[in-house]
Amino acid sequence: MHPLKNLNIWGDGGFIATNNKKIADKLYLLRNHGLVSRNNSKIFGYNSRLDTIQAVVANYKLKNKLDGVTKKRIKNSKLFDKLFKTNPNVKTVKRFPHLKEVFHLYHINVNKRDQLQQYLISKSVDAKVHYPIPIHLQTAAKYLKYKKGDFPVAEKLARTSLSIPVHEFVKEKDIKYVVKLIDKFY
């Protein structure tokens, strides 16, 4: 429930839902330093407790906001899909009809990504590059001994992917404006 995610609260937080008692019991321990009593930890865990006010906000948003946010993001992403169909320079994410896809970010894959981003920003569009370094080239993955060229698809996506606003506050006219700008750029 990071402030920038689809369902957010007034800070960082989260929840896990499961119908598996074994998993639930383990997670319950992990969220509170593995404590089984005030002074005894069964396992090493984390401080992952949500404070009361955050929990109240999260509970309210789950009950009253999630469906609306989800529907709006799906609607926005489908409009982008439809409008980009006529631009051969823009590749969108493949959709799977049997899945309910709710976009946190709407990625397009384009040549001249960085130039397009600067152009969109100059026109007040919040275009961002997310994930510019593929996982296998991250410092944390160095021990795996992968090198540039080992995952060419991931590397191409890292070079060409651009995120454009798809959140629930984006209006239809805003989406059409963004698409028009991108069409004009190419």
Regions found by a protein language model. Give the residues of each.
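Conserved active-site segment immediately N-terminal to the catalytic lysine
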Residues: 1-10, 37-42
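Short hydrophobic "helix-edge" motifs at membrane interfaces and signal-peptide entry regions
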Residues: 9-11, 155-156
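PLP-dependent aminotransferase class I/II
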Residues: 19-186
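Active-site phosphate-binding strand-loop segment of PLP-dependent enzymes
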Residues: 3-9, 15-17, 22, 112
